[in-house]
Amino acid sequence: GLGDVYKRQGYIGGGLYHSQNIEGALTTLPGARIVCPSFADDAAGLLRTSMRSKGFTLFLEPKALYNSVEAAAVVPEDFEVPFGKARIRREGTDLSIITYGNTTHFCLHVAEQLEKESGWKVEVIDIRSLIPLDKEAIFESVKKTSKALVVHEDKVFSGFGAELAAMIGTDTVSYTHLRAHETSAHL
C-alpha cells in the first residue's frame, strides 16, 4: 500500500507570525518522517518517496515558495528524493550554513554576497529531511569549515534549529574548535 502523507501548508488564510512554525514540536513525534523542501524538484521527489513508502510522513510546504521563481526547477520524470539525504546547494570552505525550507534561498543569497564582499566561500546545506536527518552531511561540512550557522524560521527557544545547533556543538567538539550559532526569523 501507499504511505500516509500529511501535508501542512497555509497558502490562503495561513498564519501571519513565525511563531506558528511548528516543526520543532513535530520532530518529537515517534515514528514520523518530516520533510521540508526548498525547491520544486525536491518537493516532487520527496512527495513521490513519501507516497511510495510505508509509515507516515509529515510534508511541510513553505507557502512563500509556491509561486517563487527561485524555487522553480525542472523535475525529471519519476524523480524521487531519499529520506535523510541533505543536498549541498553551494560548496564552500569558510563557513557551513545549515538550513531548510524558505531560508535556504535567503542563505544562498547571503553566501553569494559574502563571497563578493569578503571572499568567504560559504557552504550551504539544505537538509530537506528533518527526520530522518542527514547528520553525516552536516558533520562533514562543519568538519571542513570549522564554523557553523543554523538558519531557520522556527522559534529560537525549542525550535528545530536549536536542536541542530546543540547537536553540532555536542557532536563536533572532537575535531574542531567550533562554536555553533543559530539564527531564526522569530526572536
Which role does the model predict for each range below?
Residues 7-53:
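Conserved thiamine diphosphate
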